[in-house]
Amino acid sequence: MVWLNGEPRPLEGKTLKEVLEEMGVELKGVAVLLNEEAFLGLEVPDRPLRDGDVVEVVALMQGG
Protein backbone atom coordinates (compact mmCIF):
# COMPACT_ATOMS: atom_id res chain seq x y z
CA MET A 1 0.00 0.00 0.00
CA VAL A 2 0.98 3.58 -0.65
CA TRP A 3 -0.15 6.21 1.84
CA LEU A 4 -1.60 9.20 -0.03
CA ASN A 5 -2.65 12.16 2.12
CA GLY A 6 -3.07 9.85 5.11
CA GLU A 7 -5.12 7.19 3.29
CA PRO A 8 -3.80 3.76 2.21
CA ARG A 9 -4.21 3.17 -1.52
CA PRO A 10 -3.10 0.36 -3.87
CA LEU A 11 -0.94 2.54 -6.13
CA GLU A 12 2.25 0.47 -6.35
CA GLY A 13 3.74 0.53 -9.84
CA LYS A 14 2.09 3.78 -10.92
CA THR A 15 4.36 6.79 -11.13
CA LEU A 16 3.84 9.72 -8.83
CA LYS A 17 3.12 11.97 -11.82
CA GLU A 18 0.48 9.50 -13.09
CA VAL A 19 -1.26 9.49 -9.72
CA LEU A 20 -1.26 13.29 -9.49
CA GLU A 21 -2.63 13.60 -13.03
CA GLU A 22 -5.39 11.06 -12.27
CA MET A 23 -6.28 13.14 -9.19
CA GLY A 24 -6.56 16.24 -11.38
CA VAL A 25 -3.78 17.99 -9.46
CA GLU A 26 -2.36 21.11 -11.15
CA LEU A 27 1.37 20.59 -10.66
CA LYS A 28 2.18 24.32 -10.75
CA GLY A 29 0.31 25.01 -7.52
CA VAL A 30 1.42 22.21 -5.21
CA ALA A 31 4.28 20.89 -3.17
CA VAL A 32 4.63 17.14 -2.79
CA LEU A 33 6.27 15.27 0.05
CA LEU A 34 7.50 11.83 -0.92
CA ASN A 35 8.80 9.95 2.11
CA GLU A 36 9.52 13.31 3.81
CA GLU A 37 11.47 14.69 0.80
CA ALA A 38 9.85 17.86 -0.57
CA PHE A 39 9.38 18.70 -4.26
CA LEU A 40 7.65 21.56 -6.00
CA GLY A 41 4.94 20.11 -8.22
CA LEU A 42 6.79 20.55 -11.51
CA GLU A 43 9.87 18.84 -10.03
CA VAL A 44 8.06 15.70 -8.86
CA PRO A 45 10.17 12.63 -9.64
CA ASP A 46 8.68 10.36 -12.27
CA ARG A 47 9.43 7.08 -10.53
CA PRO A 48 7.15 4.18 -9.72
CA LEU A 49 5.60 4.22 -6.26
CA ARG A 50 6.56 1.36 -3.98
CA ASP A 51 4.89 -0.41 -1.09
CA GLY A 52 5.23 1.72 2.03
CA ASP A 53 5.76 5.05 0.23
CA VAL A 54 4.16 8.03 1.96
CA VAL A 55 2.92 10.87 -0.26
CA GLU A 56 1.43 14.17 0.91
CA VAL A 57 0.14 16.74 -1.57
CA VAL A 58 -0.03 20.31 -0.28
CA ALA A 59 -1.61 23.24 -2.15
CA LEU A 60 0.58 26.33 -2.23
CA MET A 61 -1.16 29.58 -1.40
CA GLN A 62 -0.07 33.19 -1.63
CA GLY A 63 -0.91 35.57 1.11
CA GLY A 64 -0.75 39.27 1.44
Curated annotation (Swiss-Prot):
| Any single Pfam family the record assigns to this protein | ThiS
Residues annotated as coiled-coil are none
Query: Which pathway does this polypeptide act in?
Result: Cofactor biosynthesis; thiamine diphosphate biosynthesis
Q: Report the superkingdom from the record.
A: Bacteria
Q: In the record, which positions carry 1-thioglycine?
A: 64
Keywords on record: Nucleotide-binding, Phosphoprotein, Thiamine biosynthesis, Thioester bond
Glycyl cysteine thioester (Gly-Cys) (interchain with C-192 in TtuC): where is this cross-link? 64
Biological process (GO) annotations held by this record are: thiamine biosynthetic process; thiamine diphosphate biosynthetic process
Q: Does the keyword Nucleotide-binding apply?
A: yes
Modification type Glycyl adenylate: residues: 64
Q: Which Gene3D superfamilies does the record associate with it?
A: 3.10.20.30
Entries under PANTHER family matching the protein: SULFUR CARRIER PROTEIN THIS (PTHR34472:SF1)
Query: Which purpose does this protein serve, as stated in its record?
Result: Is the sulfur donor in the synthesis of the thiazole phosphate moiety of thiamine phosphate.
The entry sums up its family as follows: Belongs to the sulfur carrier protein ThiS family.
Q: What is the name of the protein in this document?
A: Sulfur carrier protein ThiS
Q: Which organism is it from?
A: Thermus thermophilus (strain ATCC BAA-163 / DSM 7039 / HB27)
Taxonomic lineage from the root: Bacteria, Thermotogati, Deinococcota, Deinococci, Thermales
Name of the gene this protein is made from: thiS
